């Protein structure tokens, strides 16, 4: 296993390098620049040139990229162009916990809801319960996150007043864990919706295949209780493909967090990325791209490790 992890880590290096190159090229090709957006049009030519020289914007693009790459390898993501020279690492570390919390809670919600409903749907195939779960899953797959989030805000927050419209905590109040949870419920649920629906369908499909296997019929013939047959003998084998699919869904969690954080004004990396993209804050955009790519690579590696833990027959 250790050799496999090392091999996968080494294989990830050229992938991450390619992502940074592609992101840098696209970013530079986009219209506009931070100087135009943030500087006073009446500023003197000398001050304008000083600004350009300070951030190296007059260097050839490949020189800018190599300088950034060299600093990034040393753990230095540079300073924000728009935010008065604030180190990018400080901006990220201030918002990273909020994004990780949102993704963690969304993941737990998706697993806690999708797996039991998938098992229930497979236990009673083509019943009213199965049709209801299937119908709900298809709706969850079809509804865009941004639209669903806005509907929930309008109904549950604006009209009924059950939840706050956004933010991570109530302004001008001391830290309160229940207040944080209250603010977290809606964005976490919206982020989990699409993946919840997909995982429910995958769990149902895999459980149906497993429940038709000979060893399941043997377990039932021995008189084991149905719940033991379903969860001890059936679910463990049905979860193998689900773990793989869940690893592939990690990019959707990261991409979805960008939309959800913007809608709910959640102060996380997704909102920071969108704000920086509009402001053409190049150092922040590049740092966010690297972090997102690393999270995807690490997430898929964890999925592979869990796959081996669940199924001892698999060796790396």
From Swiss-Prot:
Instruction: Name the GO cellular-component terms.
Output: plasma membrane
**InterPro entries per UniProt:** BPD_transp_1_N (IPR045621), MetI-like (IPR000515), MetI-like_sf (IPR035906)
* Residues annotated as domain ABC transmembrane type-1: 96-303
Record-annotated disulphide pairs: none
Q: Which residues cross the membrane?
A: 10-30, 100-120, 138-158, 177-197, 240-260, 290-310
> Which keywords does the record carry?
Cell membrane, Competence, Membrane, Peptide transport, Protein transport, Sporulation, Transmembrane, Transmembrane helix, Transport
Any GO MF annotation of the entry:
transmembrane transporter activity
Write down the Pfam families for this protein, in alphabetical order: BPD_transp_1 (PF00528), BPD_transp_1_N (PF19300)
Main localization, broad class:
membrane
Q: Which GO terms describe its biological process?
A: establishment of competence for transformation; peptide transport; protein transport; sporulation resulting in formation of a cellular spore
Origin superkingdom: Bacteria
Statement: the UniProt record of this protein carries the keyword Membrane: yes
Q: Where in the cell is it found?
A: Cell membrane
Q: How does it sit in the membrane?
A: Multi-pass membrane protein
Q: Which family does it belong to?
A: Belongs to the binding-protein-dependent transport system permease family. OppBC subfamily.
Q: Its function? A: This protein is a component of an oligopeptide permease, a binding protein-dependent transport system. This APP system can completely substitute for the OPP system in both sporulation and genetic competence, though, unlike OPP, is incapable of transporting tripeptides. Probably responsible for the translocation of the substrate across the membrane.
Instruction: Quote the protein name from its UniProt record.
Output: Oligopeptide transport system permease protein AppB
Origin organism is Bacillus subtilis (strain 168)
């Amino acid at each position: 296993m250790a050799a496999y992890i090392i091999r996968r880590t080494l294989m990830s290096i050229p992938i991450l390098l390619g992502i940074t190159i592609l992101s840098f090229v696209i970013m530079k090709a986009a219209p506009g620049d931070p100087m135009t957006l943030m500087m006073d049009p009446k500023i003197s030519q000398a001050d304008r040139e000083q600004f350009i020289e300070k951030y190296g914007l007059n260097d050839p693009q490949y020189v800018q990229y190599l300088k950034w790459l060299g600093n990034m390898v040393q753990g230095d993501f540079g300073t924000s162009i728009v935010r008065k020279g604030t180190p990018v690492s400080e901006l990220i570390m201030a918002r990273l916990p909020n994004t990780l919390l949102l993704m963690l809670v969304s993941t737990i919600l998706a697993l806690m809801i999708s797996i039991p409903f998938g098992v229930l749907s497979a236990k009673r195939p083509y019943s009213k319960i199965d049709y209801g779960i299937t119908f709900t899953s298809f709706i969850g797959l079809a509804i865009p996150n941004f639209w669903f989030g806005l509907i929930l805000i309008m109904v549950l927050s604006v009209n009924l007043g059950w939840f706050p419209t956004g933010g991570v905590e109530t302004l001008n109040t001391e830290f309160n864990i229940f207040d944080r949870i209250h603010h977290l419920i809606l964005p976490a649920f919206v982020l989990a919706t699409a993946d919840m629906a997909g995982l429910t369908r995958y769990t149902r499909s895999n459980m149906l295949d497993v429940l038709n296997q000979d060893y399941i019929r043997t377990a039932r013939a021995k008189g084991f209780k149905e719940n033991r047959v379903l969860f001890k003998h059936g679910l463990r084998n049905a979860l193998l493909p689900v773990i793989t699919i869940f690893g592939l869904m990690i990019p959707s969690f990261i991409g979805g967090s960008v939309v959800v954080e913007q809608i709910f004004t959640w102060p996380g990396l997704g909102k920071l990325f969108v704000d920086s993209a509009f402001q053409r804050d190049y150092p922040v955009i590049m740092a966010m791209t690297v972090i997102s790519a690393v999270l995807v690579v690490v997430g898929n590696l964890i999925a592979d490790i869990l796959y081996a833990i669940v199924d001892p027959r698999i060796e790396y």
